[in-house]
């Protein structure tokens, strides 16, 4: 086992100054890219341009029938009685399309024993895999990695691509190496391992995955480190690697969730972060702690062993702290950038929903516009605010997620830990629409 930690640090362009008065943030001048909100400009992957999800955008968040998920029935089926299942992704090619192996559909999920309380599952997480002939009747195959081989004390979400005859698996090494069950240990690094997939008429299995490497760590400049984050009150992120090849530059990249570099609380909201705010909207001072972004790393060779950190593709400074599980759909020359987030991670003075958010631009690094004007694609209904989460949009327009906590008729709740019904989302230009729902866990 070894660690390749080649990280090239690039500072983003300087942030404009602002003044703070009576707990309300007043922005000063805009950044040099402030005029580029037309959604037509694109840049090279290593450019320092970062698109913005602004407070003005987030103030437009509204729910209606086109973006509200159907209620999850409390009588949902459970795909396995062995483990809780949450963040899930399919086996893909580098072009992001799902793929099969010898007629088998394969998915990967964060799992934990069902003997563990549902709320504690994150601290026991391992990546498990499932396989199916019909893309919905899933058989649990066990852990993806051999015991004791992965970095960290638990495995958090990532992505898995079939490249030639090898399986490249990317994941979040969460916690210190061999750190045990410690919810206070928030260290997160991006990791990778290579294996092979095998199948016969009865089952799917994997070999390899014994040599893991850390491929990226937060640099403190573009991406906040754990130590920097500990000066603030908000949950920290450097996780969720999503691998793909950009069809334009032909390079292999990773998207991931991060926070803007610098000590928590030192960030100063710019006019560009705030956008064209309506009259009377005041920005609470504590908004400066909310600095979510969608990060980018680029492979420096064909082996996918060495990576360079690039500036973030999109920031949500003073808007939201979490831009989890970022992923990409490329369709009709447009790049659809998706992420998931929670109601509780929106900055003070803003409110959203647990659900799926998205943006569209003309290239990988470009002037992303929020879909539907606000970025909301799918949110949980008001009477079931935590019913499902961790949405993943596939190139075919299908959206899978897991069932979280569902209200019951007697006023109680039922924990899910299993896949929800797959939803169908229509994508057209910068608009989306909920178009239907399919079977539970249908991931073709």
Q: Which residues fall in each region the model found?
A:
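Carbohydrate-active catalytic/glycan-binding domains of CAZyme proteins
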Residues: 33-444
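Secretory targeting and sorting signals
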Residues: 1-32
């Amino acid at each position: 086992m070894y660690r390749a930690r080649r990280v090239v640090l690039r500072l983003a362009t300087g942030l404009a100054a602002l003044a703070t008065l009576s707990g309300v943030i007043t922005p000063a001048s805009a950044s040099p890219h402030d005029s580029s909100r037309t959604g037509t400009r694109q840049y090279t992957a290593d450019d320092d341009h970062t698109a913005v999800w602004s407070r003005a955008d987030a103030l437009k968040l509204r729910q209606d029938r086109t973006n509200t998920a159907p209620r999850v029935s409390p009588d949902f089926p459970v795909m396995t009685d062995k483990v809780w299942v949450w963040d899930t992704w399919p086996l893909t090619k580098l072009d992001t399309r799902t793929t099969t192996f010898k007629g088998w559909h394969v998915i990967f999920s964060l799992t934990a024993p069902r003997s563990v309380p549902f709320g504690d599952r994150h601290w026991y997480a391992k990546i498990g895999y499932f396989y199916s002939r019909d893309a919905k009747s899933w058989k649990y195959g066990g852990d993806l990695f051999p015991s004791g081989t992965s970095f960290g004390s638990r495995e958090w979400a990532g992505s898995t691509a079939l490249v030639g005859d090898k399986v490249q698996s990317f994941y979040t090494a969460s916690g210190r190496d061999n750190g045990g069950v410690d919810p206070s240990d928030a260290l997160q690094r991006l990791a990778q391992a290579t294996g092979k997939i095998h199948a016969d008429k009865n089952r799917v299995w994997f070999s390899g995955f014994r040599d893991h490497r850390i491929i990226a760590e937060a640099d403190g400049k573009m991406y906040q480190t754990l130590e920097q984050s500990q000066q603030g009150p908000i949950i920290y992120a450097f996780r969720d690697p999503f691998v793909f090849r950009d069809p334009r530059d032909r390079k292999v990249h990773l998207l991931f969730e991060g926070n803007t570099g610098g000590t928590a609380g030192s960030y100063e909201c710019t006019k560009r972060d705030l956008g064209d705010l309506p009259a009377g909207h005041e920005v609470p001072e504590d908004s400066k702690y909310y600095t979510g972004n969608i990060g980018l790393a680029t492979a420096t060779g064909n082996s996918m062993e060495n990576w360079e950190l690039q500036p973030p593709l999109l920031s949500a400074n003073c808007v939201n702290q979490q831009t989890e599980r970022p992923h990409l759909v490329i369709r009709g020359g447009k790049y659809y950038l998706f992420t998931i987030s929670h109601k509780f991670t929106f900055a003070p003075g803003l409110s959203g929903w647990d659900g799926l958010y998205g943006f569209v631009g003309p290239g990988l690094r470009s002037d992303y516009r929020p879909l539907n004007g606000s970025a909301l694609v799918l949110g949980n209904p008001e009477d079931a605010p935590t019913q499902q989460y961790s949405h993943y949009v596939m190139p075919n327009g299908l959206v899978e997620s897991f069932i979280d906590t569902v209200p019951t008729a007697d006023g109680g709740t039922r924990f899910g830990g299993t896949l929800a019904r797959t939803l169908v989302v229509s994508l057209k230009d910068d608009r989306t629409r909920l178009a239907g729902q399919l079977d539970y866990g249908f991931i073709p």
